[in-house]
Amino acid sequence: MKNKAKIIMGIVIALVFVAAVGAILFKKFAPSYTQRTMEEQYKDLAKDETLICLDGFPLEEKGKIIGDTMYLPLDTVIDKMNERFYWDKKEQVLSFVSPVRGLMTVAPNTTTYTVGKENKEMTDQILYVDGDTMYISVPFYDEMTQEKSTLKWASKGEAPNRVILNADFESTHMEAKLSEKTRLRVGPNKKYDYLLELKKDQKVIVDTQSQAENDYQKVFTTDGIEGYVPAEFLSGQTETAWKRQSEEETFTQKGIGTTVCLGWHQMTQTVGAAELESKVAVAGSLNVVSPTWFALNDNKGNFSSLASEEYVTAAHAKGLKVWGLINDFDKNISLKRILGRTSTRSRLINNLVSTAMRYKLDGINIDFEGIAQEAGYAYVQFMRELSILCRKSGIVLS
């Protein structure tokens, strides 16, 4: 009887030992079956914030949710999404130039924006100011840049709040399909909790900036969720670029239909036909003359003029095009101030084009040689806006 009891006790102990070892091995090798909620995973994202997923990857910067509208930080939009937005902090005006639609402007705290001289309405406030940060509404951003960027979708109320968009259609990223169904885990190991069930053949974006760890690779789903999957399940990895949903608008300019042979005509006073005759007599194949008629003379967008209608008539009679030149040689002016402010930039552009039209000039030649780095952003905006008006008026811009 005692021997039987010992045998039974031995069996029990053995079973307990096997069970304990099994439990240890299961705990060591079995995957986590716990699904982490999106709310828990993105608990650091405030209720009024939204993730921004740009070209397949999340940004550090966050968007805002005001009422029912999602907003993007304007600085982020300009730096990383579309450089054609220009923010005039001094005069509180946002400008956007479209080669097709022209110049569009909007001020903070309004639902109205201007296209040329026409006012248009958006449903929600376009620009929102939060402390030192300016935000632009996602609907307005999409309205302005649909040919330059692609808004895939914006999700409000579905954790995590996020905006998915593309802006870079030149660089490539790595895409892959899953060879097996799997789980998207929060860390590089099967012991980590999982976020999503992923299907076989589901497309993911591979984070090529990070190395595989524990045979798990960091990936992003196409709707912006970050996690890890077994590296062996990533099949058909292909470098590809994002595709535009529409053709990109391009800035085109009027030409003269042939090779330009240009000569500058330096002037310090108004001259007429006789002076032109003496200068072009030995000019050979010259077909464009650029008299140095205009000079910026203050910080309000005004300029001096030596323009002569007689000179233009004489040049045209000789088959020459006339491109009036404007310079920035006055040491007392500031290009950053002139071009950086919406009002002075607009005054300069409108006066240049109206003067060119009045004297029947064929073109305008910009000779700004004092462009400091701090004025570069404003100068590019100036040229964009000027090019639109020149093209509309049939004037060459050089």
Segments from the language model and where they lie:
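SH3/SH3-like beta-barrel fold
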Residues: 96, 201, 215-222, 229
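Short, solvent-exposed loop/turn elements at domain surfaces
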Residues: 185-187, 269-275, 297-300
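Distinct, well-ordered alpha-helical segments
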Residues: 271-279, 336, 379
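A short, Lys/Arg-enriched amphipathic alpha-helix followed by its capping loop at the start of a domain
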Residues: 279-286
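Boundary/entry segment of secreted carbohydrate-active catalytic domains
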Residues: 181, 225, 230-277
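Primary recognition of N-terminal secretory signal peptides and signal-anchoring hydrophobic helices
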Residues: 2-210, 243-251, 255-256
